[in-house]
Design a protein with these regions (language model features):
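Conserved Rossmann-fold NAD(P)-dependent oxidoreductase catalytic core, especially the SDR/UDP-sugar
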Residues: 2, 9-11, 15-67, 72
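Strand-loop microenvironment adjacent to phosphate/nucleotide-handling motifs in alpha/beta enzyme folds
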Residues: 70-94, 99-235
């Protein structure tokens, strides 16, 4: 099972992390597949991401290429994969950042126009294990959910998080304002938040799990959709 990945769009911020992204998502997958083929491994699983569906950034494109490599190797070894979105409280996630800022008494800073769906680590693990042991050769598992019903905006997530911890969200017009007023606001049980229009190139405003030209195949699972990665031929 291959869980090595750089899955954040911010990984594209400079040439060095970009090279590491390509190495982790593409080259290492190819190398371990070659090793698996050489040693007659019975099954190879590699985790993907929702950003591989109709990718608009290099990170998503790298995972799309990884899926295509899996499809190519399915002629020699039994392969499968799974796409899912953000794992709640995982390193680099919004919730992980919120927890760190909360305990360090720092303002919340987040885009206001981005919608996200979170899985628990248990849900992500179950999906990966299910794909590994129940997925047929070349199958890509995807959660079958209505994203528009369960996606949350970052302001909504921040509001709920603060309410749970006994604070009220206080909107500031700049990050400097939020930093300068944090002590006074905390005494009133209010938490300074600066919300802005997303400025990260290649960041999808809403998540999708299935690309425009991708088609699902029939399967026995009520809560899953499956794509045959052997049919993936382009980015």
């Amino acid at each position: 099972m291959n869980f090595s990945a750089l899955k954040h769009v911010r990984s594209e911020k400079d040439p060095y992390t970009l090279m590491r992204l390509i190495d982790a998502n593409i080259i290492n997958t190819y190398k371990t597949l070659m090793l698996a083929k050489k040693t007659n491994v019975k099954k190879y699983f590699s985790v993907s991401t929702d950003k591989a569906a109709s990718p608009i950034n290099l990170m998503g494109a790298s995972k799309r290429v990884m899926e295509m490599i899996l499809g190519e190797f399915s002629n020699h070894i039994n392969t499968s994969s799974a796409r899912f979105g953000n794992v709640a409280f995982s390193n680099g996630s919004l919730l992980h950042g919120m927890v760190n800022r909360f305990y360090n008494k720092q303002p919340f800073v987040a885009p206001k126009d981005v919608m996200r769906y979170f899985l628990t680590s248990t849900e992500a693990a179950k999906l990966s294990i299910l794909s590994t042991f129940s997925g047929k050769n070349g199958e890509l598992f995807i959660p079958k959910i209505e994203l528009k019903k369960i996606e949350k905006s970052f302001p909504e997530i921040a509001k709920n998080f603060l309410k749970y911890n006994g604070y009220e969200m206080h909107i500031c017009t700049s990050e400097d304002e939020a930093r300068n007023n944090i002590e006074a606001l905390l005494k009133k049980k209010k938490w300074p938040c600066y919300l802005f229009d997303t400025d990260t190139d290649g960041e999808k405003l809403e998540e999708i799990f299935i690309g425009n030209e991708e088609k699902t195949i029939k399967n026995k699972f009520d809560s899953l959709q499956i794509i045959d990665i052997k049919n993936l031929t382009n980015l």
